[in-house]
Amino acid sequence: MGKTVASLGQGTRPDPVRSFNRWKKKHSHRQHQKKERRKQLKKPEWQVEREGISRLMQNYEKINVNEITRFSDFPLSKKTLKGLQEAQYRLVTEIQKQTIGLALQGKDVLGAAKTGSGKTLAFLVPVLEALYRLQWTSTDGLGVLIISPTRELAYQTFEVLRKVGKNHDFSAGLIIGGKDLKHEAERINNINILVCTPGRLLQHMDETICFHATNLQMLVLDEADRILDMGFADTMNAIIENLPKKRQTLLFSATQTKSVKDLARLSLKDPEYVWVHEKAKYSTPATLEQNYIICELHQKISVLFSFLRSHLKKKSIVFFSSCKEVQYLYRVFCRLRPGISILALHGRQQQMRRMEVYNEFVRKRAAVLFATDIAARGLDFPAVNWVLQFDCPEDANTYIHRAGRTARYKEDGEALLILLPSEEQGMVQQLLQKKVPVKEIKINPEKLIDVQKKLESFLAQDQDLKERAQRCFVSYIRSVYLMKDKEVFNVSKLPITEYALSLGLAVAPRIRFLQKLEKQPSTELVKNPVTEAVPPRAPSLPNDEADESPAYVSEKMSVLHKSGERLEETEHRLASGDGDEEQDEETEDEETEDHLGKAREPHTESVVSIEEAQKVKEVSVQFLNRDDDDEDGPDADFLTVKRRDVFGLDLKENEALSKKEPSKSSVKKKLTKVAEAKKVMKRSFKVNKKITFTDEGELVQQWPQIQKCAIKDVEEEDDTGGINLDKAKERLQEEDKFDKEEYRKKIKAKHRERRLKEREARREANKRQAKARDEEEAFLDWSDEDDGGFDPSTLPDPDKHRSSEESESEDTNHKMSDTKKKQETRKRNNTEDDDVRPRSRHGKKAKWETVEPLDTGLSLAEDEELVLHLLKSQN
């Protein structure tokens, strides 16, 4: 019974395989139902992304600056964090820690920090996050505008943006001068983030169709103090007018501005000021060792060469004050071969060449870069060991930016400043006021290498290099003369002659503006050059950065008015009531003192009223010295002095002037290029001529020959410019008469020479003919080869004339064959003689004299018989 129950119990147990299959079927059904429900409940990607953005925005208010050490501590998008991690950016700097949070909250920020502290990422991260929050696409147009003062800085910012933002879907573009404008215009409308320079951006705003910035969300000014100064004033004002008022603005620089006027121009709303190192002991990095040396002007080149020879395995940057200095010294040092690679970077180079130099210097481990101030701001050259300032900077801020190219991101670096004895006191005092620790060091005279003799030999061999040395000399003197701080820069204390010799020049070139200054009377203009008369202003833009801003020259020209007689003429017209407004178009008048220079006198548009003319006197002195180069553009230099008559002391004088009418003599006559050329011709300058001789001392004909004028130009000056066509036609007619007479003489001489040759040929032919007649011999009969002459016995006997026909026929046949041979020989000789004989002018052969009869020594009957025999043989 028990066994039966057990068997029944075992029979009721379910089959495990069958149970597993049923469970699997149910489980699969449940999973399928869950999957279907998830599909129905799944949100679109854009909605999920929007929810993530909202969570990030909620965390912006919770940012605690003291707790942030990495970028991941900020509430940033995954795409931005991934780009930072791939670009090896993990830890944040002080400026990034304090500004990124404020920028993410949508506030306007003015950030200032030491050089090399990471200001570029401080504004690039908020830029990416701002467009990500708005889910910006390429169809939305321009969203962020980043403006840099130089092309190199804009290029560097664009490269960092490409690395950090490569995971985003935004489109970015680089718009700088030196590239194809049409190529940029075709793509600029689809750009979301635009990195540019002010000049090229304004050009696109004026010329590119359908380009606008109405949807702009953020404006970033890198190196804002430089962009907002007078160099870019007009350009930036025009750009800001085209931008919407409602936007976020970020300003970053190592030396920030607090000018209320500049901030009002940008329409900033309650900006946040972030000065990271405002309370620091020094305004430069702590790892930067800074020194200066005192050196005479004529020893600076030797000091530079000795410095390079002693630092062959270092990476250095040498700063100069002008482009022409860089051009000349770069070529000279390449010939001196100091043993290290030398590169040159300045504003007169083509854009592609500038980018090549920039990338090449970044790649090299040991090299020297000769540069102007375009490389002084923002550029991040890795592992720069030395920064040598060959020329004194214009102020302490410029020094800070130059020295900031080394000791970046807590790395070590050294800076050396070369000062003249006249510059030491003023410059060192300014640096100490800016909290820049500098100390003086001495030069080791044993390591100083003098290169003046080598430079002299280079200039003696190369005329082009000599001209560059002259332009370098004038450019340096001009840059010192135009510096606004006359306590530091005094051109009268410079040893000009010794400096010219140190460049390799035998004689110091002429400096026109100094000569003009010496000729002027001792007025207040000379006593107080610029310091007291000109109001303080922002640092001027260097010459090589002027190409970035078309408004650079116009801004400086806007403070100029007419000088000398032109000022008096203006006062006369205003006082006499000619009009309340006067507009003078820009004119280019060449200087009459030097016709080889290209000096222009620009005049700006000015609106002056009578009352203002009575209160204000402006005296402008303009000194120009332009040098044309294959790479250089024209430099415009201006010096402006203003004197205001606040108390109206000159009212009486102006009233007296108002009663007088402007005389014709006071009006300066405009000089055109044609008039200048005529004056040069009247002075009858003797042009140098190059004469080449062979080794034997014979003169080599120069080709092409210089055309000579038979009629001297004695035309008087015309009132109207240009060329008088009537007088030119008359002159050409006179020249044609002379040319025709010369041509007729040449043809006549050519014919005479040909006739003489023909006459000489006829004489030679006559001589040969006479000689041939003298040598001619007469043969009456021909004998065998053994006989040497004529044998009379061979003649037929008249008595035996009718001999046997057989013997006679044989003799006749023999003689006929010999006669034909002789005749062919004579015909051949006659043909050759006929070729030699000259022909008469009418094409007929010349007649010869009658040949006298030969005396054969035979009787008349024998001669007749001989003739008959010969005639019969010919027939």
Curated annotation (Swiss-Prot):
Name the segments for region: Disordered: 1-44, 525-612, 734-860
Where the record annotates domain Helicase ATP-binding, the positions are 100-274
Q: Where is this motif: DEAD box?
A: 222-225
**Residue numbers carrying N6-acetyllysine:** 556
List where Acidic residues composition bias occurs.
578-593, 775-789
Instruction: Name any one Pfam family assigned in the record.
Output: DEAD
Q: Which residues form the Helicase C-terminal domain?
A: 300-449
* Keywords of this entry: Acetylation, ATP-binding, Cytoplasm, Helicase, Hydrolase, Isopeptide bond, Nucleotide-binding, Nucleus, Phosphoprotein, RNA-binding, Ubl conjugation
Task: State one molecular function term (GO).
Answer: ATP binding
Please tell me one Gene Ontology term that the record gives under cellular component: nucleolus
Main localization category:
cytoplasm
Please give the SMART domains that the UniProt record associates with this protein.
Answer: DEXDc, DUF4217, HELICc
Residues where Phosphothreonine is found: 4, 587
InterPro entries xrefs: DEAD/DEAH_box_helicase_dom (IPR011545), Helicase_ATP-bd (IPR014001), Helicase_C-like (IPR001650), P-loop_NTPase (IPR027417), RNA-helicase_DEAD-box_CS (IPR000629), RNA_helicase_DEAD_Q_motif (IPR014014), SPB4-like_CTE (IPR025313)
What positions does the cross-link Glycyl lysine isopeptide (Lys-Gly) (interchain with G-Cter in SUMO2) connect?
652
**At which positions is motif Q motif?**
69-97
Q: Where is the composition biased (Basic and acidic residues)?
A: 562-575, 594-604, 734-744, 755-774, 797-831
> Can the keyword Transmembrane be found in this entry's annotation?
no
The EC number(s) given in the record are: 3.6.4.13
Quaternary structure, per UniProt, is:
Interacts with AIM2; this interaction promotes AIM2 stability. Interacts with SCNA; this interaction causes DDX10 mislocalization to the nucleoplasm and cytoplasmic inclusions.
What note about domains is in the entry?
A: The Q motif is unique to and characteristic of the DEAD box family of RNA helicases and controls ATP binding and hydrolysis.
The record's similarity note reads: Belongs to the DEAD box helicase family. DDX10/DBP4 subfamily.
Q: What is the recorded name of this protein? A: Probable ATP-dependent RNA helicase DDX10
Which organism encodes this protein? Mus musculus
Q: Which gene encodes it?
A: Ddx10
